[in-house]
Amino acid sequence: MVRPSKTANVLQRVRECLNLGRYYDTSHASERKALRNITLPHVLYVLKNGCHEKKKDEFKPEYNDWTYAIRGRTIDGRDIRIAVAFDEKNMLIITAIEIKGSQR
């Protein structure tokens, strides 16, 4: 199977999906957010205002697709990384993690 190309402008695509309401949590993201006390408003704020961490993007052979890392600070100052992927029209929120210390 041929590896698909990465999405060219990840932040633009993320923000388009947010503006159109075309995003949803995977079950993994819902579980991890609850465990880590990360709320949907935290996630949305980081996705709207964060930066694309290209070095943290990963190809997932089991899905034959890429996940993209968006990182930023929440309004209350938490350093959060969100992993997202895209299907035809939507953005899937894969997971959310709080970064402690310097993991840039």
Describe the residue ranges of each PLM region.
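Ribonuclease/tRNase effector modules and their secretory precursors
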Residues: 1-104
